[in-house]
From Swiss-Prot:
GO molecular function: ribosome binding; translation initiation factor activity
SUPFAM superfamilies for the chain: Pentein
Name of the protein described by the UniProt record: Translation initiation factor 6
Entry keyword set: Initiation factor, Protein biosynthesis
């Protein structure tokens, strides 16, 4: 199965509590084994349960792709060591990079796949260059609709992408050219346009908030490349 509905302690905002790449997913601590098993089955990658800065909103703070995951500079040493040890045990050669910036909500501010990354205009050009080196892809600063929190209003994988309904046709064309995948507009969780906060997705599958409707699921499947 490449799509499932789930809640995290009755919250439909799954993207707030984790981030997924094609190699690994970081997930908040404290979820039951049944929910972890759904995530493993759909995303088809190992899960690393962690906190970031002693917080469960892992998906707000972390963002990345198959090359690296960026976390706040203020991540606790024990948390960073735990994530790195888990990666080493899994034999996954991937950077977990504490990034020094006045910004910390990288999950809200970075939208990335293995081809490119779109980052908030609140990052400086110097920071954009550093993120390009870390993530190993082309990085552009920009907005989607009137929103600088591009990670909140979008989700993108190596198969496709879904963004806020207020994205213009010109922005969609630009995003398709940047990420090298088809990009659609849509919502989740009964009309919520902040789709990045509503789901966990990679090239293998997508887990959406439990309030997501049937028509929304069809659009999500189409956007993320799961409809034949």
């Amino acid at each position: 199965m490449h799509i499932e509905k789930l809640d995290f302690e009755n919250s439909p905002y799954l993207g707030v509590y984790g981030t997924a790449t094609d190699r690994v997913a970081l997930i908040r601590e404290g979820l039951g084994e049944k929910k972890l098993e759904v995530l493993r089955e759909v995303l088809k990658v190992p899960l690393i349960e962690t906190s970031i800065m002693k917080s469960r909103i892992v998906g707000v703070f972390a963002a990345g792709n198959s090359n690296a995951i960026v976390v706040p500079w203020y991540i606790w040493d024990a948390e960073l060591e735990h994530i790195q040890n888990e990666l080493n045990e899994l034999d996954i050669d991937m950077r977990i990079e504490p990034f020094q910036s006045t910004l910390t909500a990288f999950g809200n501010l970075i939208l990335a796949n293995d081809k490119a990354a779109l980052i908030s205009v609140k990052f400086t050009r110097e920071e954009a260059k550093k993120l390009e080196d870390i993530l190993g892809v082309e990085v552009e600063r920009g907005m989607i609709g009137d929103y600088h929190a591009v990670g909140s209003v979008g989700v993108v994988t190596n198969r496709g992408g879904l963004v806020h309904p207020e994205a213009t046709d010109e922005e969609l064309e630009w995003l398709r050219d940047l990420f090298k995948v088809d990009i659609y507009v849509g919502t989740a969780n009964m009309g919520v346009p902040f789709v990045g906060s509503c789901m966990l997705a990679n090239s293998h599958g997508v887990v959406v908030g439990h309030l997501t409707t049937g028509p929304e699921i069809v659009k999500i499947e189409e956007a993320l490349g799961f409809l034949d």
